[in-house]
Amino acid sequence: MSAFELVTELSARFKDAVLGEQMTADRFPTVWIRPDATIDVHRFLRQEIDRPFKMLVDLWAIDETARKHRDGLPPSGITIASHLMSHERNADIRIKIALDAEYPRAKSIGSVFPNAPWYEREAYDMFGVEFEAQPHSLRILLPPGWEGHPMRKTQPGRATERPLFNMTASLFDAKEHALAADPEKFGLPTHRDGVELMILNYGPHSMATHGVFRIVLALDGEEIVAARPDIGFHHRGAEKMAERQTWHNFLPYTDRVDYLGGVMGEMPYLQAVEKACGIKVPDRALTVRIMLSEMFRIMNHLLFYGTMAQDTGAMSPVFYMFTDRERGYRVIESITGARMHPGFFRIGGLSMDLPDGWDRLVREFLDWMPSRLDDYEGMVLRNEIFRARTKGIAAYDTAMALDWGVTGPGLRATGYAWDVRKARPYAGFENFDFEIPVGHAGDCYDRTVVRVEEIRQSLKIIRQCVDNMPSGPIKADHPLTTPPPRERMLHDIETMIHHFVSTSWGPVLPPGEYTGQVETVRGLTQFALISDGEPSSYRTRIRTPSFAHLQMISAVAPGMMVADLVAYLGSIDYVMSDVDR
């Protein structure tokens, strides 16, 4: 069924509830519906349609009050957009509802998609959207007591535009009290079978939480009865920052959404921007992008591998693997000039070409790693203690993974071979030979094995990049990407006008909505951009995999021991900046 046929079926099924289809540059349909049909439409798409849309990929809000270019769209003050995916169809659909700007209220789809509540809480936190049957009084990213909803267009975008903050003693006490582990506030039970449960703050400063993040636990002895993750300690307002930066200037910020993913964070953003401008990236630039992205996949997975072993009691592997990472970072630094946050990609290509001798450095790393991985297999994967601590622990199946929006290695460990690089090739991945590693049990052990095998596949991809690196330019010949050559500047004034506009105001993207999706180290990362014909983004929505993966803790953790929770958290491989943005 094509996208057109899907919209036709949806319109026939709900008649007056479908208000129309919005034309975008994306390959999937965007459909506006009446707010009172929200639950019915989502239930139809998830449960009743052939090859259903089982995963809620993302849900977010848009403040439409300052938007100028929205001809043909239903009147809306605040828009709620939900992005659904059908893996069987390899298709997406985006559903939008229009709300009042002053008092936005919507129906919760938590009864249809188990992972909707966190996204709805974020829409309340950032935009003030009230969801029926949703504990919206709990903020999710901002601290208790925060006044206002910062993503509204009436809210300032810089700290210097806000009133001076003064942490008085009384305010400090109030904030401390608000952060207390109150079981009623977190919806935790206090008794089981007549026995009082212990309420425990796990984090936010525990090494086992891998960042500033806490889980409020209800314990019966060492057994976890209920768990409520509490996030937001690392929130920096990345989406708000995008509205104050030009399309070019926001690029370095994308490195820091997942600060271990390096250039991978730049890929979905650039995909969307280049789609908006109709820019065709040269083959050499695409191949370098793939090579560096896979280098960062290896760097991340080595860090995961070592710390996962350490979390389960093995001290030596992490030191060996950090030695390997240092070798890899030397290669990355030699090519990009930086280690973790290169900011190396540009709209339409790269910031510079590969240096002399780059291929020798990369080949040395490729020759070094395979034997090291063989050694680590004996040290970790075949280690009896590691196997005992991870096999059968925190296991879930494919259906549960799709329910909670799990992507990346966490989904593939259940036996489901879904990888954006294969299913929806981008940047030229369709030209590369590699396999998708999968597990079968969906437990901590399989999640580890999948990532180890991904290192081997990344080495295979990088070797193909080195052996088949195209020649040619590293940037597209486009006014938004490259200053014009001197001979062209001397030929006509139009060239100088384009150059002046881009360098003084910043590039201006055509009005519209554009989406980029890539398979980053943790799973599906998606940038949904709205351009209003200005040098800056009107709305930048960043969908990160870690956000969805942490929400699932409340469903997986009950029944396991506290010690098993350490292994489970390590096997998720999340980064708190990726969660909190």
Curated annotation (Swiss-Prot):
Keyword NAD on entry: yes
Any single Gene Ontology cellular-component annotation: plasma membrane
Main location: membrane
Region (NADH dehydrogenase I subunit D): 196-581
Topology with respect to the bilayer: Peripheral membrane protein
EC number: 7.1.1.-
Highest taxon, organism lineage: Bacteria
Reaction equations catalysed: a quinone + NADH + 5 H(+)(in) = a quinol + NAD(+) + 4 H(+)(out)
Keywords for the protein's UniProt record, in alphabetical order: Cell inner membrane, Cell membrane, Membrane, Multifunctional enzyme, NAD, Quinone, Translocase, Transport, Ubiquinone
Family, per entry: In the N-terminal section; belongs to the complex I 30 kDa subunit family. In the C-terminal section; belongs to the complex I 49 kDa subunit family.
Family annotation (HAMAP family): NDH1_NuoCD_1, NDH1_NuoD
Record-linked PANTHER family: NADH-QUINONE OXIDOREDUCTASE SUBUNIT C_D, NADH-UBIQUINONE OXIDOREDUCTASE 49 KDA SUBUNIT
Name of this protein: NADH-quinone oxidoreductase subunit C/D
Species annotation: Rhodopseudomonas palustris (strain ATCC BAA-98 / CGA009)
Name of the coding gene: nuoC
